[in-house]
Amino acid sequence: MTNPLLTSFSLPPFSAIKPEHVVPAVTKALADCRAAVEGVVAHGAPYSWENLCQPLAEADDVLGRIFSPISHLNSVKNSPELREAYEQTLPLLSEYSTWVGQHEGLYNAYRDLRDGDHYATLNTAQKKAVDNALRDFELSGIGLPKEKQQRYGEIATRLSELGNQYSNNVLDATMGWTKLITDEAELAGMPESALAAAKAQAEAKEQEGYLLTLDIPSYLPVMTYCDNQALREEMYRAYSTRASDQGPNAGKWDNSPVMEEILALRHELAQLLGFENYAHESLATKMAENPQQVLDFLTDLAKRARPQGEKELAQLRAFAKAEFGVEELQPWDIAYYSEKQKQHLYSISDEQLRPYFPENKAVNGLFEVVKRIYGITAKERTDVDVWHPEVRFFELYDENNELRGSFYLDLYAREHKRGGAWMDDCVGQMRKADGTLQKPVAYLTCNFNRPVNGKPALFTHDEVITLFHEFGHGLHHMLTRIETAGVSGISGVPWDAVELPSQFMENWCWEPEALAFISGHYETGEPLPKELLDKMLAAKNYQAALFILRQLEFGLFDFRLHAEFNPQQGAKILETLFEIKKQVAVVPSPTWGRFPHAFSHIFAGGYAAGYYSYLWADVLAADAYSRFEEEGIFNRETGQSFLDNILTRGGSEEPMELFKRFRGREPQLDAMLEHYGIKG
């Protein structure tokens, strides 16, 4: 039987991939990669792009194209068999990457290339790829004595296993709690859309009534609208203690020891490489220059946002007391009374907006925005093999009708699919040795409610923003003009700059001119009425300071956890969290809350000592967008400038240089504060 992963495919043969194909395919690809490395090294100096970088890039590309659908399926269609196969590949991949990173011969080949005459003939992107490779050798311990190199490899392998274990615990804990409600009165206050979804969940399990889960589309409406305080508290407790030693499943999928070990190993790794701690190591590949700069940035922002956050909370407390006689707000009351206050102040709720954002309007509206700014058109293809019938596939064409890239769109929450929204690369753009250009392919994944009762999927405005955000990442990957592996698309882009294109795209969701075609009532097609639009815009910065303070809490917690780690004392995870809450949080939270235990961004994602990137990129995005505000939000020339200077350049140059080329100067904080309505 042929292994579909080992056939030559332009797009992954999803329906044919089975768990038993995974390990053999990855093993074969890794063997080919090793052979490519040995072949290149045996060739000997002098080295050129063609005899060194190109053959390695092609071998790596095959590996990436095999592993990408495996990793993706593990996220969107998890099963015990696939999970086990995926887990078996992690140590193999980690071991390979350490082997390459510590390969003396290969390191010397790259140094020979950089120090030789050929380097001057390379283009900007190629030079950057070579420089990055040399930097990565340093960060893989190339200069260390043998026993330390071996320890580096052990740590790297263990960390990849731990990150995966952490993720599995969060997924299992999230799926491990459900509640069936048979008496509809217990769900008083809940919007029709949430009730329909909960009913559909129950029916899918052949149960009568309403099934609630800890997936965001199920959890949020309960916290926001359900009048039943006891139910809100029960769900809040279950959600905020996932994968921990507390709550309804205490100890069952506990991430405490996993986090402790992850932090200790990261610290040891950083010190092996000569860094003071993991925060220093993390910044070696980022835009920010040193830990102090990051801490100053976060602390300064906290100082500016805190007074306004305190005021916002005081107003909420006063409102809950005056209107509902509530003496003390509990954590599970915040979202509920905030929604009531928002209604009271602006007479608008997310649910009122839902009918105006049916899926086809939101998706086609997004495409229209992209067409107006960049001259890019999306065309759907229905002949592509996908992992679930609901997944769609699109190609992007520019004004010369050239295919620039394509993407899979997977919008709805499902069982066995991890929560959240993300963009990932399926295929990266690169010029092959035979002269052909391989075009980029992306995965865009969200977790929205699917269509029920014959109505189309109806999105909240927040979900529309999420869709635009992920598509911003997608454009960065798909519209790249760089043809060099490793620095095309999102590859090689520093983590604190990678959120710029995504946060930048969100702005159009607030522009009346864009909302005119992003919205349209699912029954009548009429766009968002002016009265609702005005209310929505008025409510835009409702509790903005509280939002920023929450992001600052996450950012400071992550950064200080890594920067202040002391092996003698252990990780001090909860102590650090409580200390930071004292500094920035204004909303009280219970001591039994276990937020870190499901903070996948930093324990199982790429945001370790890097969560500050969201706020950092927010400054860049708001400032970049202010140029559109000055010159016109659909100004094609401004769009072209953003495309030429930022989106198409991938990781081929330093982000600050690219930003300055677009903006004509360094970024300034004012636009972001103004954007959130914060009087700094």
UniProtKB/Swiss-Prot annotation:
Write down the superkingdom of origin: Bacteria
Query: Which catalytic residues are annotated?
Result: E470
Record has Flavoprotein as a keyword: no
GO molecular function annotation: metal ion binding; metalloendopeptidase activity
Cofactor: how and how many bound: Binds 1 zinc ion.
- PROSITE patterns, sorted: ZINC_PROTEASE (PS00142)
Q: Name one GO biological process term.
A: peptide metabolic process
Q: Which cysteines are joined by disulfide bonds?
A: none
Matching entries from Pfam families are given as:
Peptidase_M3, TOP_N
| Coiled coil regions, renumbered to chain | none
For this protein, the record's CDD domains field holds: M3A_DCP
Cofactors needed by this protein, per the record, are: Zn(2+)
EC code:
3.4.24.70
Q: Hey, which family's this protein in?
A: Belongs to the peptidase M3 family.
Q: Which purpose does this protein serve, as stated in its record?
A: May play a specific role in the degradation of signal peptides after they are released from precursor forms of secreted proteins. Can cleave N-acetyl-L-Ala(4).
Protein name (database record):
Oligopeptidase A
